[in-house]
UniProtKB/Swiss-Prot annotation:
This is Protein TIC 20-v, chloroplastic. May be involved in protein precursor import into chloroplasts. Not redundant with TIC20-I, TIC20-II or TIC20-IV. It comes from Arabidopsis thaliana (Mouse-ear cress). The lineage of its organism: Eukaryota, Viridiplantae, Streptophyta, Embryophyta, Tracheophyta. It comes from the Eukaryota. Part of the Tic complex.
Protein backbone atom coordinates (compact mmCIF):
# COMPACT_ATOMS: atom_id res chain seq x y z
CA UNK A 1 0.00 0.00 0.00
CA UNK A 2 2.92 2.31 0.67
CA UNK A 3 4.18 1.75 -2.84
CA UNK A 4 0.76 2.47 -4.28
CA UNK A 5 0.50 5.81 -2.57
CA UNK A 6 3.71 6.94 -4.24
CA UNK A 7 2.27 7.06 -7.70
CA UNK A 8 -0.76 8.69 -8.08
CA UNK A 9 -13.61 -6.93 -28.58
CA UNK A 10 -30.59 -31.30 -61.41
CA UNK A 11 -32.24 -28.11 -62.41
CA UNK A 12 -34.14 -29.35 -65.45
CA UNK A 13 -32.65 -28.54 -68.84
CA UNK A 14 -33.74 -25.15 -70.12
CA UNK A 15 -32.63 -25.83 -73.69
CA UNK A 16 -35.61 -25.84 -76.07
CA UNK A 17 -38.29 -23.61 -77.49
CA UNK A 18 -40.09 -21.27 -75.11
CA UNK A 19 -43.76 -20.76 -76.01
CA UNK A 20 -45.80 -17.99 -74.44
CA UNK A 21 -49.39 -17.12 -75.39
CA UNK A 22 -49.15 -18.91 -78.69
CA UNK A 23 -46.02 -17.15 -79.84
CA UNK A 24 -42.82 -19.09 -80.43
CA UNK A 25 -39.53 -17.53 -79.41
CA UNK A 26 -36.03 -18.38 -80.45
CA UNK A 27 -34.49 -21.47 -78.83
CA UNK A 28 -32.70 -20.77 -75.56
CA UNK A 29 -29.33 -22.49 -75.32
CA UNK A 30 -27.74 -21.97 -71.93
CA UNK A 31 -24.84 -24.28 -72.72
CA UNK A 32 -23.05 -21.56 -74.67
CA UNK A 33 -19.61 -20.88 -73.23
CA UNK A 34 -18.56 -17.24 -72.97
CA UNK A 35 -14.94 -16.18 -72.69
CA UNK A 36 -13.84 -15.24 -69.18
CA UNK A 37 -12.09 -11.93 -68.57
CA UNK A 38 -8.40 -12.43 -68.07
CA UNK A 39 -5.81 -10.38 -66.24
CA UNK A 40 -2.24 -10.27 -67.24
CA UNK A 41 0.16 -11.96 -64.85
CA UNK A 42 1.76 -8.67 -63.94
CA UNK A 43 -1.59 -7.07 -63.16
CA UNK A 44 -2.74 -10.04 -61.10
CA UNK A 45 0.50 -10.03 -59.11
CA UNK A 46 0.10 -6.30 -58.47
CA UNK A 47 -3.39 -6.79 -57.06
CA UNK A 48 -2.24 -9.56 -54.75
CA UNK A 49 0.68 -7.53 -53.44
CA UNK A 50 -1.52 -4.49 -52.79
CA UNK A 51 -4.02 -6.60 -50.90
CA UNK A 52 -1.34 -8.09 -48.67
CA UNK A 53 0.19 -4.70 -48.03
CA UNK A 54 -3.12 -3.18 -46.94
CA UNK A 55 -4.19 -6.03 -44.67
CA UNK A 56 -0.96 -6.87 -42.84
CA UNK A 57 1.02 -5.01 -40.20
CA UNK A 58 4.59 -5.98 -39.37
CA UNK A 59 5.19 -7.49 -35.94
CA UNK A 60 7.70 -4.77 -35.08
CA UNK A 61 5.16 -2.07 -35.96
CA UNK A 62 2.59 -3.74 -33.74
CA UNK A 63 4.93 -3.90 -30.76
CA UNK A 64 6.15 -0.30 -31.08
CA UNK A 65 2.59 0.98 -31.43
CA UNK A 66 1.35 -1.07 -28.48
CA UNK A 67 4.14 0.06 -26.14
CA UNK A 68 3.42 3.75 -26.87
CA UNK A 69 0.10 3.52 -25.02
CA UNK A 70 1.93 3.00 -21.74
CA UNK A 71 3.25 6.58 -21.94
CA UNK A 72 0.03 8.48 -21.11
CA UNK A 73 -0.95 5.85 -18.56
CA UNK A 74 2.34 6.17 -16.68
CA UNK A 75 2.17 9.96 -16.89
CA UNK A 76 -1.34 10.02 -15.44
CA UNK A 77 -1.06 7.23 -12.88
CA UNK A 78 -1.49 9.77 -10.05
CA UNK A 79 -5.15 10.16 -11.00
CA UNK A 80 -5.72 6.64 -9.73
CA UNK A 81 -4.62 7.39 -6.18
CA UNK A 82 -8.18 7.16 -4.85
CA UNK A 83 -9.49 4.21 -6.82
CA UNK A 84 -6.32 2.09 -6.51
CA UNK A 85 -6.15 2.43 -2.73
CA UNK A 86 -9.85 1.63 -2.29
CA UNK A 87 -10.26 -1.31 -4.66
CA UNK A 88 -7.88 -4.26 -4.40
CA UNK A 89 -8.51 -5.62 -7.97
CA UNK A 90 -6.97 -2.44 -9.34
CA UNK A 91 -3.96 -2.91 -7.07
CA UNK A 92 -3.47 -6.44 -8.38
CA UNK A 93 -3.87 -5.23 -11.98
CA UNK A 94 -1.39 -2.37 -11.66
CA UNK A 95 1.17 -4.04 -9.39
CA UNK A 96 3.25 -5.65 -12.23
CA UNK A 97 3.73 -2.16 -13.67
CA UNK A 98 5.10 -0.61 -10.46
CA UNK A 99 8.81 -0.98 -11.42
CA UNK A 100 8.23 0.72 -14.77
CA UNK A 101 6.10 3.43 -13.14
CA UNK A 102 8.78 4.03 -10.51
CA UNK A 103 11.44 4.40 -13.22
CA UNK A 104 9.19 6.76 -15.19
CA UNK A 105 8.56 8.95 -12.14
CA UNK A 106 12.15 8.86 -10.88
CA UNK A 107 13.17 11.94 -12.89
CA UNK A 108 10.87 14.99 -13.17
CA UNK A 109 11.58 15.57 -16.86
CA UNK A 110 11.15 11.98 -18.04
CA UNK A 111 7.65 12.68 -19.33
CA UNK A 112 8.79 15.69 -21.33
CA UNK A 113 11.82 13.88 -22.74
CA UNK A 114 9.68 10.95 -23.84
CA UNK A 115 7.21 13.37 -25.42
CA UNK A 116 9.96 15.04 -27.46
CA UNK A 117 11.42 11.68 -28.46
CA UNK A 118 8.13 10.17 -29.59
CA UNK A 119 7.07 13.26 -31.53
CA UNK A 120 10.28 14.09 -33.38
CA UNK A 121 11.86 10.63 -33.66
CA UNK A 122 8.72 8.63 -34.47
CA UNK A 123 5.78 10.79 -35.56
CA UNK A 124 7.82 13.09 -37.80
CA UNK A 125 9.99 10.29 -39.16
CA UNK A 126 8.76 8.98 -42.55
CA UNK A 127 10.88 5.86 -42.09
CA UNK A 128 8.22 4.59 -39.71
CA UNK A 129 4.95 3.33 -41.16
CA UNK A 130 1.83 5.44 -40.87
CA UNK A 131 0.42 2.79 -38.54
CA UNK A 132 3.21 3.40 -36.01
CA UNK A 133 3.11 7.18 -36.39
CA UNK A 134 -0.67 7.35 -35.95
CA UNK A 135 -0.70 5.24 -32.79
CA UNK A 136 2.25 7.16 -31.36
CA UNK A 137 0.52 10.46 -32.08
CA UNK A 138 -2.68 9.18 -30.52
CA UNK A 139 -0.78 8.35 -27.31
CA UNK A 140 0.82 11.82 -27.34
CA UNK A 141 -2.52 13.61 -27.78
CA UNK A 142 -3.98 11.56 -24.94
CA UNK A 143 -1.11 12.65 -22.71
CA UNK A 144 -1.54 16.31 -23.69
CA UNK A 145 -5.20 16.15 -22.63
CA UNK A 146 -4.02 15.43 -19.09
CA UNK A 147 -3.14 19.12 -18.81
CA UNK A 148 -6.81 20.01 -18.26
CA UNK A 149 -7.54 17.91 -15.16
CA UNK A 150 -4.14 18.94 -13.78
CA UNK A 151 -4.96 22.64 -14.14
CA UNK A 152 -8.36 22.07 -12.57
CA UNK A 153 -6.82 20.37 -9.55
CA UNK A 154 -4.23 23.10 -9.11
CA UNK A 155 -6.85 25.84 -9.13
CA UNK A 156 -9.46 23.90 -7.15
CA UNK A 157 -7.91 21.81 -4.38
CA UNK A 158 -10.48 21.10 -1.65
CA UNK A 159 -9.54 19.20 1.49
CA UNK A 160 -12.95 17.77 2.39
CA UNK A 161 -16.68 17.96 1.78
CA UNK A 162 -18.45 18.09 -1.56
CA UNK A 163 -15.45 19.60 -3.33
CA UNK A 164 -13.28 16.64 -2.41
CA UNK A 165 -15.96 14.25 -3.70
CA UNK A 166 -15.93 16.08 -7.03
CA UNK A 167 -12.15 15.86 -7.28
CA UNK A 168 -12.19 12.16 -6.41
CA UNK A 169 -14.81 11.48 -9.08
CA UNK A 170 -12.86 13.48 -11.66
CA UNK A 171 -9.57 11.77 -10.89
CA UNK A 172 -11.14 8.32 -10.95
CA UNK A 173 -12.83 9.05 -14.30
CA UNK A 174 -9.55 10.22 -15.83
CA UNK A 175 -7.72 7.17 -14.50
CA UNK A 176 -10.35 4.74 -15.80
CA UNK A 177 -10.24 6.41 -19.21
CA UNK A 178 -6.45 6.05 -19.29
CA UNK A 179 -6.68 2.41 -18.20
CA UNK A 180 -9.32 1.53 -20.82
CA UNK A 181 -7.31 3.38 -23.49
CA UNK A 182 -4.20 1.41 -22.53
CA UNK A 183 -5.98 -1.96 -22.65
CA UNK A 184 -7.83 -1.14 -25.86
CA UNK A 185 -4.90 0.44 -27.68
CA UNK A 186 -2.37 -2.16 -26.56
CA UNK A 187 -4.51 -5.20 -27.44
CA UNK A 188 -5.69 -3.74 -30.77
CA UNK A 189 -2.13 -3.03 -31.87
CA UNK A 190 -0.98 -6.53 -30.95
CA UNK A 191 -3.65 -7.90 -33.30
CA UNK A 192 -2.67 -5.46 -36.06
CA UNK A 193 -5.88 -3.43 -35.75
CA UNK A 194 -6.10 0.36 -35.66
CA UNK A 195 -7.56 1.64 -32.37
CA UNK A 196 -9.40 4.94 -32.57
CA UNK A 197 -9.81 6.61 -29.21
CA UNK A 198 -12.64 9.11 -28.68
CA UNK A 199 -11.54 12.76 -28.47
CA UNK A 200 -8.09 11.71 -29.70
CA UNK A 201 -8.21 9.92 -33.06
CA UNK A 202 -9.25 12.92 -35.17
CA UNK A 203 -6.51 15.13 -33.75
CA UNK A 204 -3.94 12.39 -34.33
CA UNK A 205 -5.10 11.97 -37.94
CA UNK A 206 -4.53 15.65 -38.65
CA UNK A 207 -0.96 15.49 -37.35
CA UNK A 208 0.11 12.39 -39.28
CA UNK A 209 0.71 13.03 -42.99
Amino acid sequence: MAIISQFFAPLPSLTGTLTLTGRSFLPLNLDTQFPKPRLSRDRAATLVLQSKGDDSVDASDRIISAVCYFYPFFDGIQYGKFIITQYQPFQILIQPLFPAIRAFKSFPFNGFLIFITLYFVVVRNPNFSRYVRFNTMQAIVLDVLLIFPDLLERSFNPRDGFGLDVVMSLDSTVFLFLLVSLIYGFSACLFGLTPRLPLVAEAADRQVL
